[in-house]
Amino acid sequence: MANPKSEYDVIIVGGGLNGLATGAYLQKAGLSVGIFERRDESGTFCATEEVLFPGVKLNLHASLLVTHFGPAMVDLELEKFGLELCKPAGAEYGYFYPFLDGNAAMFAHYDARKTYEMWQRISPKDAETYRKVANFLGPRQDVILQQALCSKHTDESFLQFLDEFSDVPVFPKDWLFMSGFEFVENLFEHEQIRVGLLSSAAMAADDLKSRLAGPLSILAALCGFTSNFYTARGGSHDVVHALVRCFVLHGGKIFYNCPVEKIIIEDKKAKGIVLSSISCYPDAEFKAGKAVISDLSAQTTFLGLVGEEHLSVSARASLKRYDYRGGTLFTNYYVMNERPDFACAQKFPEANNTYSFNFGAETVDQAADLFDRCDVRGVLPDPPVAWGGCANYCIADPTQAPPGMYTVMSWCFVPYKLNSLGGPGAWDDIRESYADKAEEVLVQYLPNLKTAKVARYVNTPHDYVRRNAHSFGNMHPSGATTEAQMWSWKPFAGCDAPRTPIDSLYICQSMGMSNFTHLGAAYVAASELMGDLGIERPDWWRAKAMDGAKELWRREGVERRTSVD
């Protein structure tokens, strides 16, 4: 067996999106980087596979891409490496929520005035409230995103972040101490506006009943951050391909089939890694001259690879109660032989050309029951409710199915553990029966699914865990985003993420806000490490949040309008 190079400036544990992006930044900047991945493929939660039949490409997790939000799309030249983000041609709306009476809450892709005009059709008074909020927050959107997604989170920066919302005209003074539900019910009057907004915000937060995280997710929806999703040409995995190409072109090395057994800690400093006995290089040690970075979740990194003996009592206590609940997804994929035709398109024809949607709950009470069942009681919602972010893939990218066919995905919120049924293994027993129930609900909103369905594929929460065990059932390996677990106190107070209490050990996962495909965690981790090493960032490392989006919209020929007036 040939012996590989055994020392790198930086070793990254895990070849997920943020691990790849962190590595690409550092390798492009001149450091030598080795990435060690457990599986035989990078980007476990950004996979695209032909699991049904040839030509049907199913995105087996990440589907609502926001890579254009973060700096990496520009800094790493991801489009040069093959990434092509797609939305439906001519689409003006990015998200909608249908109701059984034929109404729909529509959220514009890039123009706040279009959202305002659609809301006027349902509730003129609520539309005026939205106008006041959008006019205030619109000019601040890029600053808000830079602070939330692409900056190191500290207690001080959190207070600065909150200052951006201190004078919003219609906000209750105590909005931070409200749940997401209470916040929405204080701002808006019409039930359908409330439910539509909550459903949009649910894609950004694990628990809308949480204080702080709940209302902040409502803000994300009001700013249009949850109605600005894309797919990628050929499927979500194209993001992974672009990152790998960038990393490898600049000289980076990826070790596949190489699970890491432990991080070497000497004198309270991370010095390298030891591979598992079942890796391609059994029990091999690799040294890190400058840093080790973990792209794994908090418990796996600290309690597993680092070891409790290297952690303080307070850190151990925080990590043992780390919250992975919420955001658990049950997924139906459909192949149809005609374009999806939603019932609400009779009144709102724009829905049929909108990429993302949710469905199921018709009232705020039903929505609250969804979170109560999933996060508090641990029982299955019946009937199912899809609030995880559904996708109408092929109206945006026809290459994801054979000619004349369309793929649609529904993400239902569910509990993971199913303790009342004997544990997570019960998902194997109820997979098809629960999928049938979810389909029965969807047909009420998408009636031609019944006659146009060619095939269905089901992914349970347990299937996701089998693919990526360190997610622990959450849609994000970074864990839940709640008032106790976000910003500078995630993964635990005093961690100082992306730094850790272990010298030269960094994380690019399980920190700040939710780790979506904007790659902000990678940007922050790489930036902070460069600063700690005293290395000036190269001239190409200068992009800000939304720079990629602005260029994308310029080429699409659309004018972004963040305010109504």
Curated annotation (Swiss-Prot):
What cofactor does its activity depend on?
A: FAD
The record's induction entry says: By the monoterpene alpha-phellandrene, but not by acetate.
Influence of temperature on activity: Optimum temperature is 40 degrees Celsius.
Control of this protein's activity is summarized as: The presence of molecular oxygen causes a 40% reduction in specific activity.
Q: What happens when the gene is disrupted?
A: Mutant cannot not grow aerobically or anaerobically on limonene, but it can grow on perillyl alcohol or on acetate.
Name its cellular compartments. Answer: Cytoplasm
> What's one GO MF term for it?
oxidoreductase activity
Which Gene Ontology cellular component terms are annotated?
cytoplasm
Q: Which domain of life is it from?
A: Bacteria
Which reaction is recorded as catalysed by this protein?
(4S)-limonene + A + H2O = (4S)-perillyl alcohol + AH2; (4R)-limonene + A + H2O = (4R)-perillyl alcohol + AH2
Keywords recorded for this protein, A-Z: Cytoplasm, FAD, Flavoprotein, Oxidoreductase
Please give the pathway this protein is involved in: Terpene metabolism; monoterpene degradation
Q: How does activity depend on pH?
A: Optimum pH is 7.5-8.0.
The UniProt record lists the EC number as: 1.17.99.8
- Family per similarity comment: Belongs to the carotenoid/retinoid oxidoreductase family.
The record describes its quaternary structure and partners as:
Heterodimer composed of CtmA and CtmB.
Q: What does this protein do?
A: Involved in the degradation of the cyclic monoterpene limonene. Catalyzes the oxidation of limonene at the primary methyl group, forming perillyl alcohol. Hydroxylates the R- and S-enantiomers to their respective enantiomeric form of perillyl alcohol at a similar rate. Native CtmAB oxidizes a wide range of monocyclic monoterpenes containing the allylic methyl group motif (1-methyl-cyclohex-1-ene). Can also catalyze the reverse reaction, the reduction of perillyl alcohol to limonene, but with lower efficiency. Cannot use molecular oxygen as an electron acceptor.
State what protein this is by name.
Limonene dehydrogenase subunit A
Q: What is the lineage of its organism?
A: Bacteria, Pseudomonadati, Pseudomonadota, Betaproteobacteria, Burkholderiales
